[in-house]
Amino acid sequence: MTAFRSICQAAARTSDPATPKVLSIHTVRAANSCLDILEETGCLRRCRCVFHWFSGSSDELHRAVQANCWFSVNEMMLRTRRGREYARQLPLAQLLTETDLPPHAGEPFSAIAIQESLERTIGAVAAIRRLNPEELRKTLATNARALLSSPLS
């Protein structure tokens, strides 16, 4: 956690509200500790914090949602009951997709594999949430643009 704290301190110190830094965070069994550090260092205020493949408790999920964190989901996450439930519960405005490719270090993958994985993820999330896949795709594209281009409010 020492390295994570140092990264968060540097990110918060150098982040510009007009073009905030984006932190992609994988919190394996440490969501509350990570949220504490993000809060203490100012990252929650000065950066865009994205939880990659979030698997913490429902209380931790609620805390991260309330802190305006973003969440990226992938097709592997959606294979678990918890992953599907979180994909259903997350506010649409804080939802992103990801691939988590390649599946193993050194394993080849292609742009087509990435596109297919994203399409499967969008289809699965649309089914879970009973949404039109095309409308969800548009919302996710809007979210990605906002994540990468909007100033902090």
Language-model segments: what does each one mean?
Residues 71, 103, 146:
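Active-site micro-motifs of SAM-dependent methyltransferase domains
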Residues 64, 87, 100, 136, ...:
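Conserved, mostly hydrophobic/aromatic
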Residues 57, 79-81, 104-107, 151:
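Surface-exposed loop/turn and secondary-structure junction residues enriched for glycine/proline
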Residues 2-3, 109-117:
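Alpha-helix N-cap and loop-to-helix initiation/capping positions
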Residues 27, 99, 121:
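Ser/Thr-centric signal marking residues that sit
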